[in-house]
Regions:
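Extended ligand-binding regions for polar small-molecule ligands
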Residues: 41-54, 119-121, 127-139, 211-254
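Bilobed "Venus flytrap"/periplasmic-binding protein-like clamshell domains
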Residues: 36-53, 112-164, 185-186
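A ligand-binding cleft/hinge motif common to bilobed small-molecule-binding domains
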Residues: 77-80, 85-98, 143-146, 173-211
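Ligand-binding clefts/hinges and TM-proximal coupling segments of bilobed small-molecule sensing domains
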Residues: 10-12, 139-160, 198-199, 234-258
Length: 258
């Protein structure tokens, strides 16, 4: 999950906020997962593993289906009312508001270049006459646009920004784009869910370097003790192979953050 406007967000208003204090049940860890996220099955397992590492009973709360309005308001409300921690957030500097903090990463994913062409092995093989795309606002697409701007006009591909990873993949499948740069976990999930994407494949980003991003969990900034313990638990699960086992068990395109 990524909300571009997070850095500008004021603490959201929640009606009767005074009713909600810190949960006093010291035997449970309530963790939220977003059913819209591509890593949902992985997040569920990692949340349970974190709870176990803390010797707590894990209580999963699935959110997102009936959300309306700004996600940032919903995140604040569920952290205030329901969950101690919310899994599935990219570790991007200077994005999150002061009232929110993020754990260390538990997996590292990559942005991938996807095409329907069976012959191309990398971006360098894509003819300059072809149109390439990327999901607008992502760090990988920003780097791609910066790279294209550094080239002479005659050496550039035409670049078309798209609203979402799913739209980008559909445009590749429909032949509107020769290739598209998307979040690897999104491609993993969407290819399983949509038969139109079965023929799509990943090619190398060369001449661009790999574009990776760590993913962790958010919680209220005031929960400093919990944050420290979550980081220790994640580090232990990364070190003992638990997270790697979860990722491999799902064939998920990511690696543990060491």
């Amino acid at each position: 999950m990524l909300i571009p406007a997070l850095a500008l967000a004021q603490t959201p208003y929640v009606q009767d906020e005074w009713k909600y204090g810190t949960r006093q049940d010291g035997t449970q860890l309530h963790y939220c997962v977003d059913e819209r996220d591509p890593d949902l099955p992985v997040a569920r397992k990692i949340g349970a593993a974190i709870a176990g590492a803390l010797l707590l009973e894990g209580k999963e709360h699935t959110v997102g289906e009936d959300w309306s309005g700004e996600d940032i308001d919903q995140i604040y409300q569920v952290l205030l009312e329901t969950c101690d921690v919310f899994l599935g957030f990219k570790l991007i500097a200077d994005v999150y508001p002061e009232w929110l903090t993020i754990t260390r990463g538990y997996y590292r994913g990559s942005y991938v270049l996807v095409t329907a062409n069976a012959d191309w092995k990398s971006l360098a093989d894509v003819p300059l006459s072809q149109v390439i795309g990327g999901t607008i606002g992502t760090s990988a697409d920003i780097r791609l646009m910066q790279y294209l701007e550094s080239l002479k006009p005659a050496e550039r591909w035409t670049h078309f920004p798209v609203a979402s990873d799913e739209t980008a993949l559909q445009d590749v499948a429909d032949g509107k784009l020769a290739a598209a740069l998307v979040w690897g976990p999104s491609f993993w999930a969407l290819q399983k869910a949509n038969a139109d994407f079965a023929k799509l494949r990943i090619i190398a980003l060369k001449p661009l370097p790999p574009s990776t991003m760590d993913v962790g969990a958010v919680l209220l900034a005031r929960e400093t003790f919990l944050r420290a313990n979550l980081d220790q638990a994640i580090a232990a699960l990364s070190g003992d192979g638990t997270i790697e086992g979860i990722l491999k068990g799902f064939g998920f395109p990511a690696t543990p953050v060491r």
